[in-house]
Design a protein with these regions (language model features):
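Extended, charge-rich alpha-helical interface modules
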Residues: 1-129
Length: 129
């Protein structure tokens, strides 16, 4: 069973970039089969030409890089957690999660606005900069 819901263009592109990263990083054949199946089910959603412009593809590439950075940060944090090492590096890694997620949200919003997405995700956080 699967559920069909409306989501923003940026959300679909975000999900696809994460699935691409998982496909590159995960070797387990059962997990990989699930990842590829999910990816294939989402690809038709970004098939329209409006989502395939150079500008949108560049934003999607940036989004993938940000998501890859998040993957690396999370891996590093989990190693520190496993070692019970809550030093300055751990704190910087933890802080970098929300800095990097802010970049991610910005890119998703740019994609949504540039594609005319009917749905646009909004964030509401205190300004910390």
């Amino acid at each position: 069973m699967s559920i069909k819901i409306d989501v923003s263009v940026g959300e679909i592109m975000d999900k696809l970039t994460i699935l691409d990263i998982k496909a590159d990083k995960i070797d387990d054949t059962e997990k990989l089969a699930n990842i590829l199946k999910e990816r294939e089910s989402l690809l038709p959603a970004i098939a329209p030409p409006a989502y395939q412009t150079d500008e949108i593809q560049q934003l999607a590439a940036k989004l993938k890089q940000v998501n890859l950075r998040l993957w690396e940060i999370e891996d590093a944090i989990r190693l520190k957690e496993a070692e019970k090492c809550f030093d300055e590096e751990f704190i910087e890694l933890a802080r970098s999660v929300y800095f990097t997620n802010d970049q991610r949200a910005s890119l998703k919003k740019q994609i949504n606005l540039k594609t005319g997405s009917e749905l646009v995700e909004e964030k509401s956080y205190e300004d910390y900069k």
